A protein has these predicted regions:
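Conserved DEDDh/DEDDy metal-dependent 3′-5′ exonuclease domain
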Residues: 81-197, 203-207, 211
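Acidic, Mg2+-coordinating catalytic module of metal-dependent nucleases/exonucleases
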Residues: 168-259, 519
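C-terminal, non-catalytic extensions of nucleic-acid polymerases
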Residues: 220-296, 324-327, 355-531, 540-723
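Conserved catalytic palm subdomain of right-hand nucleotidyl-transferase polymerases, strongest
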Residues: 55, 156, 298-312, 454-458
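Conserved RNase H-like, two-metal-ion catalytic cores of nucleic-acid enzymes
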Residues: 20-113, 124-145, 271-299, 308, ...
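Short, Lys/Arg-enriched N-terminal segments with co-localized hydrophobic residues
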Residues: 1-18
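Catalytic palm active-site di-aspartate
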Residues: 207-208, 305-310, 458, 529-542
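Short helix/loop capping segments that flank catalytic or ligand/cofactor-binding pockets
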Residues: 63-64, 123-124, 164-166, 214, ...
Length: 723
């Protein structure tokens, strides 16, 4: 609902809305609004008001005598189109207590309040309220995404729901036109509750809660009511997928022809043992991201970039995955091993003796996932050679390792084998539906929100398949964060018997393995022309020379798509949709991103390119836009000089990084500060987060530097260099 309220008192600011000081607020507005508000009772016997509210604060960070502290100087609370603000926590406590009194809230009758990045606000306000036992749900220490007070105020995080910052949330609103205001608050200035705020500054404060209110209204339109909105973005995807696989996407579950029973029967066969789960966790790896050490630090002209069209979704719809319970096959020799790895999905422990590379351009094994001898030679986190390497892998990983290394001896143990089949038909259809929507909606301005939703959900399909079954619990109790170790056996039993589960953890382990294998076909084919790779993309020299490989690979994908379509009687056109401009985008193909005029890499997630007159930077820990701005500034827009400056000694001053250091303050602080108006004010925050701009230094590790020097001086041996 949208409240239409005539407000006679309150401060008007640009845009025509009213922002009411809490000390002038007429609480009759609340009574009138909530008297007509809809309430919803859930199956857990909890009643919620369906009124959209949002809360936000602005803070100041300061340092005195080496002590860091931070404090709030304005809060704003929106319920529908009414925005109330105050300047102190005492005012906010009083405001909330009045809401609780008027609405008769308690732990069984609640009001949901959305906060964009709840973890930040929670650190400032947590000691001002009493929290319900087990009422704070966190994904990590200091990262609550839901927090319930004993008086029935239920804070939820809209950031983890949207997966976007407020600027992008505003841009993707479908029915509301609100822009995130920028540039109106200088966060380096000291402001307190006594600091005068201009109309523009108040507009900035109000705008953030307005965006959240508009966003939540659109979520209600999508899901039906406020209690049905998922807690997280992944929850959104889970709900969509569960509906597709169990009920064919239909709301009338009785009309699904027994689909629920069929899928439930499959899930009952897909169970794990604690030992099996731990072995699978050891075998799991993410995307492969690395640079060819032979190209490191060099400025290379005419580098072609190729990327896969939806890499993870592709393998999910074209490859075969573990089905049924795992078993321990009897493997007596290499012949047995080759049979099982050709006909089953395998996970196993392996020990290599005297491991050496047999290709120059790249090394596959991650040192962080292996136990190695002291003589290991490391290539920026990847194993070049070692006299002993122990690790846990899949049979798909072994395919890559065979092509990248040689060894004197390999000992395999603890082999778990799974019958392999395509993923269930309805799951594949759900993935392809999202891919088709993403492709058709891309580049259509009025459909941007729907495009972003389909794209985000498609990208989350893989992520939810590898969510840890067993993880630490993060608890907030007595003003403190604690973690508790889970009971492995108990959690695995719970997982196996879950009646809502629709995924199998081993599927996710093999999704990334297949994707790495696909990427490595390009790395190996490119040979010495290979420069860099990142999960689903590859940068190579002499791009035209490698077109035969690209075409051959794409044909392999096309054949795999044909096979799965034949198996499940699916329409191949859904796998090859057209964009708005009439370009066909088959899923899984290598697609050219064009040619870089200049390219330079300093290692994983560190590269600079110049293309079509534009400088572009990817550097972990540094804002892309801020980093480019700095390089252009110090190079005086000289591109060649910018590439020279981008090296392992580059330091970006704090004012150019866009990077903030977060320091958590858990103890009360009393300090006398002078604000920008000259007011001397005593502040006494109970807790908070101090934010400070920080510089960025691009440095190469000592171990990697030693490897590069040895490589340059020809001190590293490659056992059998590829022809």
């Amino acid at each position: 609902m949208i409240l239409v309220v005539l407000i006679k008192r309150g401060q008007q600011f640009k845009g025509g809305e009213s922002m009411i000081n809490v000390n002038e607020f007429n609480y009759d507005i609340v009574k009138r609004a909530f008297n007509h508000a809809k309430t919803i009772r859930t199956n857990k016997k909890i009643t919620y008001y369906e009124i959209v509210t949002s809360f936000d604060i602005e803070t100041t960070s300061a340092v005195q005598k080496g002590q860091k502290f931070a404090f709030m100087y304005i809060w704003q609370f929106a319920f529908e189109n009414v925005i109330v603000y105050g300047r102190t926590w005492e005012e906010y406590q009083h405001f909330i207590s009045k809401l609780v009194e008027i609405l008769q809230l308690n732990e069984h009758k609640r009001l949901i309040v959305y906060v964009h990045n709840l973890g930040y606000e929670f650190q400032f306000m947590r000691k001002y309220f009493e929290w319900s036992e087990n009422g704070v749900f966190a994904v990590d220490t200091r990262e609550p995404i839901k927090a319930l007070t004993t008086t029935g105020i239920e804070y939820k995080d809209s950031y983890i729901l949207a997966g976007l910052n407020l600027d992008h949330v505003a841009k993707n609103l479908q029915h509301h036109k609100i822009q995130k205001l920028v540039g109106n608050l200088d966060y380096t200035q000291i402001r307190t509750y006594k600091t005068h705020l201009t109309d523009e500054e108040l507009a900035y404060c109000a705008n953030d809660v307005k965006i959240v209110v508009a966003y939540i209204h659109e979520q209600i339109e999508e899901y039906g009511d406020i209690t049905k909105i998922p807690l997280t973005n992944t929850g959104r995807v889970r709900r969509y997928t569960r509906q597709q696989v169990y009920f064919n996407g239909q709301k009338q579950h009785r009309k699904t022809g027994g689909q629920y029973e069929k899928y439930r029967k499959l899930m009952d066969t897909l169970t794990l043992s604690p030992f099996e789960y731990e072995q699978l966790k050891r075998a799991f790896q993410g995307g492969f991201t690395h640079a060819n050490a032979n190209k490191q630090g060099k400025v290379i002209d005419n580098v072609t970039s190729y990327d896969f069209t939806s890499s993870y979704p592709t393998v999910m719809v074209t490859e075969q995955f573990p089905m049924g319970r795992g078993f321990h096959p009897k493997i007596k020799n290499r012949k047995d091993f080759n049979f099982y790895r050709g006909h089953y999905c395998l996970v196993f422990d392996i020990k290599f003796t005297n491991l050496f590379p047999k290709i120059k351009q790249e090394h596959y094994l991650s040192s962080s996932k292996c136990k190695c001898s002291n003589d290991m030679v490391e290539d920026n986190g990847r194993i070049f050679s070692a006299s002993m390497v122990e690790t846990t892998i899949t049979n798909v990983d072994f395919e890559i390792i065979e092509r990248a290394y040689e060894w004197d001896k390999a000992e395999v143990s603890n082999v778990i084998a799974y019958r392999k089949e395509y993923l269930p038909k309805n799951l594949i259809k759900a993935i392809i539906h999202l891919y088709k929507n993403k492709t058709k909606l891309k580049g259509v301005p009025e459909k941007r929100p729907e495009y972003m939703r389909s794209k985000g959900m498609l990208n989350s399909m893989y992520g939810m398949s590898v969510t840890n079954i067993v993880h630490e619990e993060n608890n907030y109790l007595n003003d403190d964060w604690t973690t508790s170790e889970p009971n492995l056996k108990k959690e695995i039993v719970k997982y196996n018997h879950s009646k809502t589960r629709f995924l199998f953890y081993p599927w996710g382990v093999f999704v990334t393995a297949y994707a790495r294998r696909n990427l490595w076909t390009g790395i190996i084919s490119a040979g010495n022309d290979y420069c860099y790779s990142d999960t689903d993309s590859i940068k190579i020299e002499n791009g035209e020379k490698h077109l035969p490989y690209i075409k051959k690979y794409n044909q392999v994908v096309k054949n795999k798509v044909k096979d799965v379509c034949k198996k499940y009687e699916l329409d191949i056109e859904d796998f090859e949709p057209f964009t708005i401009k009439g370009k066909q985008k088959p899923i899984g193909y290598w697609d050219s991103e064009g040619v870089y005029d200049k390219f330079k890499t300093l290692g994983a997630k560190r590269y600079l390119v110049f293309q079509n007159g534009k400088l572009m930077l990817t550097c972990a820990g540094l804002s892309k836009s801020k980093g480019v701005d700095y390089l252009l500034k110090v190079s005086n827009n000289n591109i060649d000089k910018a590439f020279q400056i981008f090296n392992d000694e580059m330091t970006v001053p704090s004012q150019y990084t866009g990077k903030l250091t977060h320091t958590y303050i858990d103890e009360p602080v009393k300090a006398l500060v002078t604000d920008i108006d000259g007011n001397k004010v005593e502040v006494n925050p109970l807790s908070g987060i101090h934010l400070a701009p920080t510089e960025f230094t691009l440095s190469i590790s000592k171990i990697y530097n030693q490897f590069l020097l040895a490589l340059i001086h020809g001190e590293l041996l490659i056992k059998d260099v590829q022809k």
